[in-house]
Amino acid sequence: MKNKFVELVEKSQLRTDLPEFNPGDSITVNLWIKEGDKQRIQAFKGFVLRKRNRGLHSAFTVRKMSSGMGVERTFQTHSPLIDSIIVEKRADVRRAKLYYMRGLTGRAARIKEKV
């Protein structure tokens, strides 16, 4: 059981502007990157490998293929560095964690699209 004050502070920091998404969905995460004294938005486009719902400590992992190499990146859902999340395709998967996709390539790595 958490302290009521801690719950109140955490609730005030939760983001409500992000769309609903699930494992398997193809998304683009636009996040702020700081290079020297400049800031810019960088897009990371891939599919959601896993999602962890823990209130303020929620996180999700996005996987993409870059130059034939699999790249995974984990984001904190309520991070102020995330500018926006765009859901491009909804997927129809039967698992909550898609770790088996790491070993698949080509046609075997396709995800069925939700109609």
Curated annotation (Swiss-Prot):
Matching entries from InterPro entries are given as:
Ribosomal_bL19, Ribosomal_bL19_CS, Ribosomal_bL19_sf, Translation_prot_SH3-like_sf
The cross-references to PROSITE patterns, in alphabetical order and at most eight, read:
RIBOSOMAL_L19 (PS01015)
Task: Cite the Gene3D superfamilies for this sequence.
Answer: 2.30.30.790
Q: Which GO terms describe its cellular component?
A: cytosolic large ribosomal subunit
GO terms for biological process? translation
GO terms for MF: structural constituent of ribosome
Q: Does the keyword Ribosomal protein apply?
A: yes
Keyword Ribosomal protein among UniProt keywords: yes
Question: Which UniProt key words apply to this protein?
Answer: Ribonucleoprotein, Ribosomal protein
Domain of life the protein comes from = Bacteria
Q: Which SUPFAM superfamilies match?
A: Translation proteins SH3-like domain
Tell me the protein family, please: Belongs to the bacterial ribosomal protein bL19 family.
Query: NCBIfam families per the record?
Result: rplS_bact
* Protein task: This protein is located at the 30S-50S ribosomal subunit interface and may play a role in the structure and function of the aminoacyl-tRNA binding site.
Q: What is the protein named?
A: Large ribosomal subunit protein bL19
